[in-house]
Amino acid sequence: MNTELKLCQLLLAGVLLAGTCAARDLSTINPPFPRIGNCYGAGLGSKTWEEGSNYWSKLSLIIGGGYALSYDWEQPHWPKKLAKVEENIARLRQVNPHVLVLPYVDVVESSDDPAVPKHWWALKNGERWSGWPGKFRINTALTEVLQFNLDKVRTEICGRECFDGVFYDVWGPDDWLVPRTAELRDGKAVVMLNDGSLPRKGFASLNGVLAEDEINRVIDGKVDFEDFLARYLRWTRESRKPVVTMIVCRPQNINNDPSYWHKLNWKERQAICERARASDDKTMRLGLATALMGDGYFGYDAGTSERGTWWWYREYDAPLGHPHGPARRNADGTWQRDFDGGTVVVNGTLFDVVAELRAKSRDVSTGRVGTRFTLPSFDGRIFLPTDEPATTAADVAPRVTAKPPETLRVAKLDNGVIAVQTPGGLELRFDREAKLRHVIWRSQPLLTGGWPLARIQSSREFHSDSISGGVAEASDGEVKLTFSGTLGAESQRVAFTETCVVKPDNRFTLRFDFTAATDLDLRVWRHDFALPVARYANAAVSTDAKRVTLPAALKDESLLPSAKHVTIETGDTTLNMESSVGWSLVDHRKYGTDEYLLTGYPVRGAVKQGTQWSVEISITVAAKRAAN
């Protein structure tokens, strides 16, 4: 009898679960553009309908939003919060049936929760370790860990009709968890993840991925815009439907260090967010216009430590409707897409351009009316057709173009960026923190780097406390830039002076002078230059002792031992580098970035207060002579 009763209970539970697993039909999901999303901060579980409905009703994608799990599925507050989530979503779908809601699941880490089995913790030297303040890593190599997460997603998320699928944070397109999750709800569960950048695989099992702050890395010179856009368009084209790939980015001038935010109270965080809201609309426009080149979503907020701020911009309200077709690349390097309600142009190049439209239009961002618009580097605009009279005043002139100047030239760009151009086609760009963000040759990115990557033993990274300086001297014979300031990580400090001298014959010398202002305990102090694989594959690299050809496909991590003189020959260009420290060459694709890395290590370990050291690099760029 007990056996029969138990069987009946199991059958009844199965019937009930099957009923709750019923998913709504997502085949008709097709919200108009722009498609705005919120990562982690929608507050469906903490806000009342009256408090949040005006904002929620304008969103097309909500990630997390009140139901965010990190091995704390049994927390006593979840039932009450979940009830509010379900109520708000039910009301939201009545006014906004296109919105998709994906609860957040963290597979890789948990708070110090006694409910987590001890053997699940990931250990280093026998101790738990943290990759995020207040969290400890989980050993995701254990199949039982993945099975636990899959089972919870099946019952607690896909078992609730209010949710459309799941979002896995800090997770890539693996061969176990993602494919099994994609099978839930008869293969109709929406599956999205955040792999840090847009991966190059996983299309068959995923509806989309989060491009978290990759737009910021484009601006920083760490990611090529064309490569990023190609990956984004592929995800919106080839992934499962409905597409949920989303671009999210932050103001360039906001501190994105999680250890910094971890020390702030709520009021301090909110004050920073409010100041940042209108501090960098240009990055917002670049991200939004890039997202509009494909069928994905966009979000702009205060960064990884305060993701999901409720910021809204006039561009979000542009009535674009739906696209007439795919985006197209223009001859000047810009991309353009036409919609029912207007045209979007994005300039992901390193130079200002003049966009020309067929019909008289109004720039949503500036209010300017006409057919010709100056579009700065790393910017985007939405143009709506109008019968308004054209703006009579001339538009701003382009500040830097692909055409080299006749003599050495200095230009000041957005966000404190300083550009130095030579008559031969070399250009250097320094940001407000004295970092050499771009080395450009004949209008194309050549390399990035030079600035130190430095961490103390706790893995906290050095960041600038204060920096001053800029152009010290400028003449036809040379341009000299000088910066000085302090770098800090927790209580450890380093004072520095940086100088850069640029000559008209396409030579520049970059020098750093450092002084340990306190005792230092360094995990790493590294200077590097990144060489994009797309440009340098099959290039010849030589030192005084060895010569190699850079492999098109990843083979060995180590490519060249340390040397102070390095020559790189690629296509029609030759680079010669002379340095006070030795540089080794590694294939950084082993660590997930498509670049070869020249790395130098001037100091390491324990460094006494007052210790001084210098790093000087001279680089000459020249057109390679044609073979006879």
Task: Write out the residue ranges for each language-model feature.
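Short, exposed beta-strand/loop patches in secreted or surface proteins that constitute
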Residues: P326-R328, W335-Q336, L408-K412, I418-V420, ...
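N-terminal secretory signal peptides that target proteins for export/translocation
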Residues: M1-L5
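Extended, loop-rich substrate-binding clefts of extracytoplasmic carbohydrate-active enzymes
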Residues: R455-A517, D521
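Glycan-processing catalytic domains of CAZymes
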Residues: R24-V396
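Bacterial N-terminal signal peptides
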Residues: C8-G19
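Acidic (Asp/Glu-rich), glycine- and aromatic
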Residues: V494, R507-R547
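Beta-strand-rich N-terminal accessory domains
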Residues: D395-R460, D556, A563-T574, S579, ...
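Beta-strand-rich recognition/accessory modules
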Residues: Q421, L446-H463, T486-G488, D521, ...
